[in-house]
């Protein structure tokens, strides 16, 4: 993964009265310190590199000297303020050249010799070197980081000439090292001498190291302004496979009020990571959120607008501090993730044993080897503490991506007649990852207890596809016409199959079935239908049971949150 997302190096170049200068690069070329050691070891041009691809990636730009990099990366003034991207062989340079607009007129009013005191730097460029085949989303993210650093440096330069001071220090150290190299036997890299003495150089090194490890960059330029950045490719990944940022954004846009926010760390540690000037609303969301509380309830408890809770939840998810789940209730069905480690002595097993001393992780995961609802773990004779511990264990496993939640989807499946053997494209059922479950099994018709999500009947006036309008009661002509209009979108054999069901003789059942018909394409799970239509779970399950001859029930992950349920490695 690091081959495609980690930068090769970070480079700072400037252009001014002294020409184009490479102020700093990291990792710097340590091989320059002892060039003789490289020539004393004959090596075949066909020999295999013993250090592997990682060393090649580290030195991907090593063939470019400092002078060459300063020439090609210090752009013209006309290119400042926009994205800079240059590809040379297998290296791609990405930056955001920035022009330093100094008020020379103001300097001349207060200084009798403005020519001597005028700033010598005209522009600078913070450049990240990447592999040429890097994903475009990675390129855009690193350009965004370069732009943020450049904006802060430009601000500090205007405020206190911070960049000019650091550049003068770097150039003085480079001259000093160059003089030492002339007196000694060979050249030395000046950057290892610059690093301990220059705060800006240490910040750039920290940014590079963070990008190569966690993907989260937090800098305090000039110990004053903060630069925060998240490389989503490093934070969101599943089973050694990258999750594209576009998939994360699509899932975040599909968040609904019936979803819940699950923090991936405890409240205390998460609050300690927040910046001092963070939003008070974010703190309230973190303190109020719960795995058994949906976002609408969270907004009410935190006294915030639902839209603001959506934005804060998306912010936490993007930064890898939380994931979106469905609120925990006894009707939830979970199965062990195919990527979960079942080793007896794995690090996760040791953590689980410390957290829950009376249980071991492999035994608990074995209970979820097949899809199982949480209601099956409940016992009327068990103490309340046992149910609390069960919730804590499920939350712990969800945080580590060890469990996958399965939802119930319904597909209309009416057998075609001989006269019409071909189905329309819209009638093809959604392919389920888990096989269909018969409605006659207890698991499919679990009505739940009064404390279950059967009582979750929230209204959602903002839903576009909501059709829970008030209908006239009784078997009136208006009801018949509305039912016929709803069934008109079906093919002839589908209408005939539905009307042949005994439950279709009941006008109320037929009208409810027709009203929910657009949900029976395998794209809306049971909980979404409950929320959109303000309907109880028991009502829907009874309807599915009555029309089971033309319906197929399947269980699989919710595509909206499936991207968050994969195992982190």
UniProtKB/Swiss-Prot annotation:
Result of knocking out the encoding gene: Lethality towards the end of gestation caused by a range of cardiac defects, including outflow tract abnormalities and ventricular-septal defects.
Biased composition, class Polar residues, residue ranges: 34-52, 441-468
Region of interest called Disordered, as start-end residue ranges on this chain: 27-60, 441-476
Chain positions with Phosphoserine modification: 476
Protein known as: GATOR1 complex protein NPRL3
Pfam family, one: HTH_NPRL3
Annotated organism of origin: Mus musculus
Compartment annotation: Lysosome membrane
Gene: Nprl3
Family, similarity comment: Belongs to the NPR3 family.
SUPFAM superfamilies: Galactose-binding domain-like (SSF49785)
A molecular-function term among this protein's GO annotations: GTPase activator activity
